Curated annotation (Swiss-Prot):
Stated name of the protein: ATP synthase epsilon chain
Keyword Cell membrane: yes
SUPFAM superfamilies, A to Z: Epsilon subunit of F1F0-ATP synthase N-terminal domain
Gene, per the UniProt record: atpC
GO MF annotations, alphabetized: ATP binding; proton-transporting ATP synthase activity, rotational mechanism
Entry similarity comment: Belongs to the ATPase epsilon chain family.
Role: Produces ATP from ADP in the presence of a proton gradient across the membrane.
Annotated InterPro entries: ATP_synth_F1_dsu/esu, ATP_synth_F1_dsu/esu_N, ATPsynth_dsu/esu_N
Location within or outside the cell: Cell membrane
Subunit comment: F-type ATPases have 2 components, CF(1) - the catalytic core - and CF(0) - the membrane proton channel. CF(1) has five subunits: alpha(3), beta(3), gamma(1), delta(1), epsilon(1). CF(0) has three main subunits: a, b and c.
Coiled-coil zones: none
Principal localisation: membrane
Any single Gene Ontology cellular-component annotation: proton-transporting ATP synthase complex
Membrane topology of the entry: Peripheral membrane protein
Amino acid sequence: MPIRVAIVSPEQEVWSGDADMVVARTTDGDLGVLPGHVPLLGLLAPGGTVRVKTGGREISASVDGGFISVTHQGVSILAETAKLT
């Protein structure tokens, strides 16, 4: 069962879709999120990355500042700046 993911900045939605796993660099270290993860809110590390694994491929985005929100509905990456790499 995949998890719904959205990576957004104030200017645009950078990527959204279903994923098997999300890995984000937070101020506390790398955070891996699988479907069914407990809800949480984390602070993204400056100059960090977000990796989304979906269907055997990996999507990577560079992010700078912002938050990661994990709920039962999915994962939201709300970054000050974000772009696919």
